[in-house]
C-alpha cells in the first residue's frame, strides 16, 4: 500500500496503483472498455473464475443428468454446505454454522420464524428506521403471523441525522419488552459500520437474541462472529462477493442454537443420511444446513464457487486495508475537487465506521447519476438524494477513482446533469 501523503494529482493515483498488493486480481474480472464501474456494492462484476464454475456445473448437468447430485467436481447435494465452509472465514465463524441458501429475504423469514418467540411482556422486535425496506417487510410479516400488530410490536430506532444510527440509542431501546433484534451491519445508504461486538454484548446482557443483515459488509469488512457471539446473520452474495444477479444468499446460526428446530422446515432441512428415507417426521441436520428449506438453486449457486476461491487468495484483511485506503483517497479527492458544487459527504469519515462505499448527497442526485452513466461512470442512486460510489478493492483502481472524480467535476461545472430528469429510473 502506498504510504505517501495524499496528493490530488494523476501521478499520485498511478503510484497508488503501482503499490497495490491486490492489483493482479483486476485481470480476473470482466471490465467493460471505456467504463468505470463503481456499483459493486449493488452488483459485483463477473469474474472469469465465477464464469468457469458456472460452466462447470452446466457441464455436470450435461454429463451426469440426475447423477450430478453426487457425481462430478462439485456434487450438487453437498454444494450448499461446501460453500458454507468456504464462506465461514469471511465472517469469523465455524463451517458448521454457515450455509449458502435461499435469498436474503427468505433467510430473514427463516431466522425470525426460528428466533422470534413472543412471551409475556417480551413481544417486540427491535430494528431501525434506516434499514433496507425488505427487512422491514419481512419483520412485519412475521409479527402478523404471530397474530400481533406490527405498528405496536416493531420498534424502529430513530436516526438523529437521517444518515446514521447512534449505538447508544440502539442500546437504550433494548428494553424489557424486546424479544429479538435485527440490525444492518453496514447501513445501505450511508455505509456506516455498526459495532456488532458491542451491540451483541449489550443485547445478551438483557437476555435478547440479536442478528445482523450483512448484505453491505460481507466481502468488504472482516467479521469475528466466534468472538462476538452473534446469534444469527443473513446476507446476499451478489454484491462484494460477486455471485451474480440472483445469486444464492447466505445464513449463519451460532452453534449454540443449531439444535433449534427451524421455524420454516423443508426437505433440505434434513440430515443428509436421512433425507431420502422419505419419513414424515423431520430429522433435522445438527448444523446450519437445517435452516435450508427447498432444493438448492444449483446454477444460481455455481458462480460463488469461483468467486470464493478469489477471496481465499486475496484475504479479507488485505481487502479491507485497500478498501479503507481507496475510499479515503476518494473522499480526499472529492473534498479537493468538488467543494464548489454543494455536495455533502453522507458517510462516516472514521475508518472504523466506514464501509466499502462513498455516499454523496445532492439535491440533483438522480440527474447527476444519469449524467455519470452517460459519461461512462456507473454509480447508483438512492432516494431521496444519494449518489453511492463503491471503489471495490478487488477490481477498481486509483486511476479509475481519479478519473471518475474529474468526470463528476466536469458534469457539475458544465451543468451537464440539467439535460436529465431529476427522478430515478425503474431500477435505480
Curated annotation (Swiss-Prot):
Catalytic activity annotation: L-kynurenine + H2O = anthranilate + L-alanine + H(+); 3-hydroxy-L-kynurenine + H2O = 3-hydroxyanthranilate + L-alanine + H(+)
Gene encoding the protein: kynU
Subunit composition and interactions: Homodimer.
Family: Belongs to the kynureninase family.
Function field: Catalyzes the cleavage of L-kynurenine (L-Kyn) and L-3-hydroxykynurenine (L-3OHKyn) into anthranilic acid (AA) and 3-hydroxyanthranilic acid (3-OHAA), respectively.
Name of the protein in question: Kynureninase
GO cellular component: cytoplasm
Top class in the EC scheme: hydrolase
Pathway named in the protein's UniProt entry: Amino-acid degradation; L-kynurenine degradation; L-alanine and anthranilate from L-kynurenine: step 1/1; Cofactor biosynthesis; NAD(+) biosynthesis; quinolinate from L-kynurenine: step 2/3
Keyword line: Hydrolase, Pyridine nucleotide biosynthesis, Pyridoxal phosphate
Cofactors named for this entry: pyridoxal 5'-phosphate
Protein's organism: Bacillus cereus (strain ATCC 10987 / NRS 248)
Domain of life: Bacteria
Record GO terms (molecular function): kynureninase activity; pyridoxal phosphate binding
GO terms for biological process, alphabetical: anthranilate metabolic process; L-kynurenine catabolic process; L-tryptophan catabolic process to kynurenine; NAD biosynthetic process; quinolinate biosynthetic process
Positions bound to pyridoxal 5'-phosphate: 104-105, 132-135, 213, 216, 238, 267, 295
N6-(pyridoxal phosphate)lysine modification, residue list: 239
InterPro entries membership: Kynureninase (IPR010111), PyrdxlP-dep_Trfase (IPR015424), PyrdxlP-dep_Trfase_major (IPR015421), PyrdxlP-dep_Trfase_small (IPR015422)
EC number assigned by the record: 3.7.1.3
Disulfide bridges in this chain: none
